[in-house]
Amino acid sequence: MSIKIALAGNPNCGKTTLFNALTGSNQFVGNWPGVTVEKKEGKVKGNKEDNITVVDLPGIYSLSPYTGEEVVSRQFILDARPDAVINIIDATNIERNLYLTLQLMELDRPMVVALNM
């Protein structure tokens, strides 16, 4: 059984940093929004069965897309139906991040909220 986990959140909240930590990848990170412009997939390191895939999605503020990057993220979350979503939230600006969190909760899929400082 394979498991697919999506990393979702606002731009520049730490999604790619978490992706790199979980997968052992070395994807480029920057301290500004818009660094990740396409989805990236990797296997969780240390998982002997090699059956857990993590998907790093471009940053989005809501499930109502305005940019190409937001369309990529929205389509993956709604159409690919990941087994779970890790919603990364910038703990320094929680209020701005919660709109997306509420939308993700309404999808009724397993979700973890991860606060990042």
Where are these regions (language model features)?
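Conserved C-terminal guanine-recognition region of P-loop GTPase G domains, centered on the G4
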Residues: 44-49, 72-117
